[in-house]
């Protein structure tokens, strides 16, 4: 798991979000050491202001504490955070913690019909970035 490559459209669209003034942080259930290794091996470190581990608060996502910790580390209210994830459970956890959310709905990823739908859903990060930039207007 330490050397997973990013999907082809990821770098370009993280760059688009940064250029538009969106602050980016990575939040993972991995340990900080593994999170740092993953972000470095993927070549994505330059796009993120922070790389955060849920391990810091000793509660894993989808518990609310990791999302709240991310907001605190960014110096914003939890309602100002938008989690972008490829897993419906992560999106649901973020929304239940008070965040906005976006789902990268790659093939086989589906939303849980029992939970609220995030305001941005796209088939890849390009579509999600388009939706975020439109929502931020």
Segments (PLM) and residue ranges:
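Short, acidic loop-to-helix structural element flanking the phosphoryl-transfer center
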Residues: 1-26, 36
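Asp-based, Mg2+/Mn2+-dependent phosphohydrolase catalytic module
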Residues: 15-18, 31-32, 36-137
């Amino acid at each position: 798991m330490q050397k997973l490559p990013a999907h082809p459209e990821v770098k370009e669209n993280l760059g688009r979000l940064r250029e538009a003034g969106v602050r980016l942080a990575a939040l993972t259930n991995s340990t900080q050491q593994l999170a740092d290794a993953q972000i470095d091996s993927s070549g994505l470190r330059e796009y993120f202001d922070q790389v955060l581990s849920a391990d810091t608060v000793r509660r894993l996502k989808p518990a609310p504490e990791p999302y709240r910790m991310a907001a605190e580390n960014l110096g914003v209210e939890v309602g100002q955070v938008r989690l972008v994830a490829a897993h419906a459970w992560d999106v649901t956890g973020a929304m239940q913690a008070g965040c906005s959310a976006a789902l990268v709905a790659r093939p086989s990823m589906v939303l849980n019909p029992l939970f609220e739908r995030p305001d941005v859903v796209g088939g890849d990060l390009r579509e999600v970035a388009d939706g975020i930039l439109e929502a931020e207007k």
